[in-house]
């Protein structure tokens, strides 16, 4: 039997390997709560999706079967293990439409909590169901696919929330001097985390990396000689992202100061960013830290680490006008994702286009 925290050579897993293992184990637990035939779909999905995507799809599909047991008289006395593929093709498009209606507000089975879904949530759950049905239809296990006869929920584009140039400076200045207004325990905590927080904020704003990529960084991933960090992207690919002098200064200040003075707990020795508990910082801790500071500087904007990524993408696009460069640096696999987010922002560019073409010399 294999020890899941160590490889055969007894070498500890890095953050990304460990997180894949944890998610795979979690997926197995979720699959136990789905109809047995669903395992085939998730096995087929494995080569082309991350464990996190499969977990999200498993939760979404579980909601669908709970809906059938709660709302469809045919399945009122069913338990999860009674469902068969033929039950999928016995449903009509109207059943799928009722499910979409149900998703807008429903009670979660485990704890009775009220769950609501907006456009994005509805689209994701419908996408999961279509993919699930599509697998059994493609393999001719079912002859009908009612999900294809139901329109996907319409997604409206939302304006990108980001920090303006002056707000970026205000945020960093605020973190640097926030201690001036603190005393006692709050001041001690601030002093302990100040350089780390400035390093994280400067890194997120200066490279546009994702928060999950940021917390996954190890000390060895930082290369000051070339001013680059090796990040593990969403799909597991590694890429070097380059940073400027401001980021280098903030990272160096943190690493040679607080980070070197820390004694990390066992298993966290390699982590670049440590919590006050001397463990690798988690995604939520970074999110809370960003919100804590941003709320003081831009109370009317809900700023998260992802908004810092949008801020970087916006600045880079405005400086270079090169959407392909922005897509590459942000690690977007499809340039259309980038276009959708950033091409709409540059109103000035479109205004210039209006006066660039002269019809008649005046």
Show where each model-derived region lies.
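Conserved catalytic core of the tyrosine transesterase superfamily
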Residues: 1-362
């Amino acid at each position: 039997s294999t020890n899941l925290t160590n490889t055969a050579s007894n070498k500890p897993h890095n953050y990304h390997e460990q997180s894949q293992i944890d998610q795979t184990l979690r997926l197995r637990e979720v699959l136990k709560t789905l109809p047995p035939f669903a395992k085939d779909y998730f096995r087929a999905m494995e080569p082309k999706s991350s464990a996190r995507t499969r977990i999200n799809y498993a939760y979404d599909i579980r909601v669908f079967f709970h809906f059938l047991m709660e709302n469809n008289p045919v399945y009122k006395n069913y338990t999860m293990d009674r469902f068969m593929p033929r039950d999928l093709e016995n449903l009509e498009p109207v059943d799928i439409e009722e499910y979409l209606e149900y998703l807008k507000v429903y009670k979660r089975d485990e704890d009775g909590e009220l769950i609501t879904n907006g456009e994005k949530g509805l689209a994701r759950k419908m996408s999961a169901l279509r993919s699930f049905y599509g697998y059994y239809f493609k393999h001719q296990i079912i002859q009908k696919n009612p999900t294809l006869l139901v329109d996907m929920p319409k997604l409206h584009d939302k304006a990108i929330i980001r920090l303006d140039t002056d707000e970026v400076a205000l945020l960093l200045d605020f973190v640097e001097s926030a201690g001036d207004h603190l005393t006692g325990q709050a001041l001690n905590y601030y002093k302990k985390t100040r350089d780390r927080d400035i390093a994280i904020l400067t890194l997120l704003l200066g490279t546009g990396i994702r928060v999950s990529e940021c917390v996954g960084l190890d000390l060895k991933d930082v290369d000051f000689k070339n001013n680059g960090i090796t990040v593990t992207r969403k799909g597991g690919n590694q890429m070097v992202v380059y940073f400027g002098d401001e980021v280098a200064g903030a990272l160096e200040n943190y690493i040679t100061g607080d980070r070197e003075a820390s004694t990390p707990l066992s298993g966290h020795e390699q982590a670049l960013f440590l919590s006050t508990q001397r463990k690798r910082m988690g995604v939520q801790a970074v999110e809370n830290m960003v919100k804590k500071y941003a709320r003081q500087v831009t109370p009317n904007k809900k700023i998260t680490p992802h908004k810092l990524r949008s801020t970087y993408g916006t600045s880079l696009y405005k400086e270079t006008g090169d959407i392909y460069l922005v897509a590459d640096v942000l690690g977007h696999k499809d340039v259309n994702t980038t276009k959708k987010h950033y091409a709409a922002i540059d109103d000035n560019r479109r205004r210039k286009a209006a006066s660039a073409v002269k019809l008649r010399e005046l």
